[in-house]
Amino acid sequence: AESNTGRSDALILLSLNKRTKKITLVSFLRDSYTYMNIPDAARNPERCCKLNHSYRWGGYPVLIETLENDYKIEIDHYISVDFKSFPKLIDALGGVTLKIEPYEAEYINRTTTQIDKIQSGDAVKLNGAQALVYTRIRHVDAAGDLGRTARQRTIITALIKSAQGASLGQLNNAMDIVLPNVHTNYGKGEIISLLTQAFAQKWMNYDIAQMVMPSEGNYVAARIYTYYGRVARMQLDTWVIDYPVAARELQLALYGKTNINIGSDHVSAIDLYNQGLVPTLGGSTASGTRAQSSHTAPAQTSQVETQPTEATAAHETTSPAAEPATAAEPEEAND
């Protein structure tokens, strides 16, 4: 986003598990149709819109609450980097090296004049300005926004690799440059402690896994009429999601277990939409309203009792640019 009140351009959760020595990057599709408990109901009386609007209308608290409600996970911290600050983070670590496809280089060089030309290749080094442009392109191929989320995770992975060869002093210097330009609920002392642990325990050498939520098959393209800001009902191109199934999948990936049971009576929100209904965002119940009607249900509440106890408070989320929060650990892996 261009400011602290813009829509989130990237929503990426970073999970670091010291027990399994694994980092997981999860991109949330920003056009996901969801309920959000925004404080100003006049902005959207139905409180249903695209996921990235939760940041614009309610800031970090509403964004985090929405993700927690939809996917039944816990998020403790956030780090937000805007478009002006993002290049500084890249440059502070000496740039990033990654594979650039010929069609990506051609598209960037043809559509962007404010940066140095980018070459294609298996190991191309980008500076901060070039990396920002790379993370934002989405009309370059048929993958669209899915391709963009993949490029955002590629940049984060490349950043972690850049940090592998840095000294603790270099990492501290990078933080001194970046911290004045980010928004976070981490204290500076906490960040220094995390950096010290990351360096001593070689977190940057952990295996890195990537995911997109919802995954393929758990969402469908939809056109829904809803309130957009203070404007009367407007058509919204979005994704209708089977949240209980998606939440169960994410819990298993992050925690290694789940407390979500998908019963035989489960009716997918996707099926409801395909039947000409706009599903209430409870998702796990056989309910819906005719297209273009109001949505009154809060975020989906599938058969969840409590958060999995093994690995709660494990994850970070980012908004609005493409940087992950500093890694936190699952409780069971804490020192």
What is each model feature region?
Residues 1-335:
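Non-catalytic, solvent-exposed segments at the cell envelope interface
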